[in-house]
């Protein structure tokens, strides 16, 4: 009996895709710290993280409901709860909707209405626009659909300030440009899975050379965008962004050259290291804010 209950609980947890949520929440804290230069109340941070977790869990759960048919086809996703019938589809839908409503009400109560509305917008965009419209129709699915994954920085900033500014927009764009290289590198490895499921990911419909060229272009856009925040951040962020950006661009160029040269291609290496890149850059931003270091802009003025 206990084993069955535990299995059911784990199935519902798996619906939320916790590993995906982890990285998204990593971006929320630095955005909040930057918004008030490290003076944010810890209770507000924890409340925003909890509300953001519920919102992301809602979006991921509803995504699993819509994608249950293709999850059964793809080897990478065949063990997801709905793909193996561990959770009834109707229960998963109610679970996802309940989390979504709870996240809105929680953030409205603990932060402000703007933060709550941004979470609702994120859930709606991810499920209705990305999952139901873009994902199975165009190779640009992850380009525009990835905007949902950029929203935690907007939620975090608005939870502190009750408004939006250019800084969270820059952070939004960093994640926006980061998403295609991150996702396409994974899709290169699981190309046959996506092809079998009828999902037109770029690696499915284009040559590896074209894919790696696009990865390279988006990587450059990501690094250049990250540098535009340097005047509003401190020297730690500036140094970390320069080093991490150069390192990531080197890996992207290596992947492109290996494809052009006919060498063994290892896209998963770029996929895994892209997680490290994003984490390092945002941690650098958080350290700057917590230490209360002078911004680069003030040092140069």
Swiss-Prot record:
GO terms for cellular component: plasma membrane. This is Protoheme IX farnesyltransferase. It is found in: Cell membrane. Carbon 2 of the heme B porphyrin ring is defined according to the Fischer nomenclature. The chain crosses the membrane at residues 9-29, 42-62, 89-109, 113-133, 142-162, 168-188, 211-231, 232-252, 280-300. Belongs to the UbiA prenyltransferase family. Protoheme IX farnesyltransferase subfamily. Its EC number is 2.5.1.141. Pathway: Porphyrin-containing compound metabolism; heme O biosynthesis; heme O from protoheme: step 1/1. It catalyses: heme b + (2E,6E)-farnesyl diphosphate + H2O = Fe(II)-heme o + diphosphate. The lineage of its organism: Bacteria, Bacillati, Actinomycetota, Actinomycetes, Mycobacteriales. It is an enzyme of class 2 (transferase). It is a multi-pass membrane protein. Converts heme B (protoheme IX) to heme O by substitution of the vinyl group on carbon 2 of heme B porphyrin ring with a hydroxyethyl farnesyl side group. It comes from Rhodococcus jostii (strain RHA1).
